[in-house]
Structure formats: C-alpha cells, structure tokens
Amino acid sequence: AVFTVRNNXPYSIAPGVLTGGGAAASTTGFQLAPGXSXNVNVP
C-alpha cells in the first residue's frame, strides 16, 4: 500500500511511520516542508 502524507501547515513537520508486526516501512521518518507531500510505501 502507498500512503501520501501532505503538509497543509504553514511550518515544517516531521511525520513518523510505524507498522505493527511484520516488515518495516521503507521510510520511518522524514521532514516535510509547508505545502509538500511524500509517498510512503508500507507492506
């Protein structure tokens, strides 16, 4: 599955991704600038 994380705030955010059991997500944390988005692939 692919989740898209979008920052609608006027400041940078640092989202984190945690999966329960099994394989880990390919990206577990990152910084996202205002108005930017990133895709996270999860098992």
From Swiss-Prot:
Induction: By phytoplasma infection. It comes from the Eukaryota. InterPro entries: Osmotin/thaumatin-like_sf. Belongs to the thaumatin family. This is Thaumatin-like protein 1. It comes from Glebionis coronaria (Crown daisy). The lineage of its organism: Eukaryota, Viridiplantae, Streptophyta, Embryophyta, Tracheophyta.
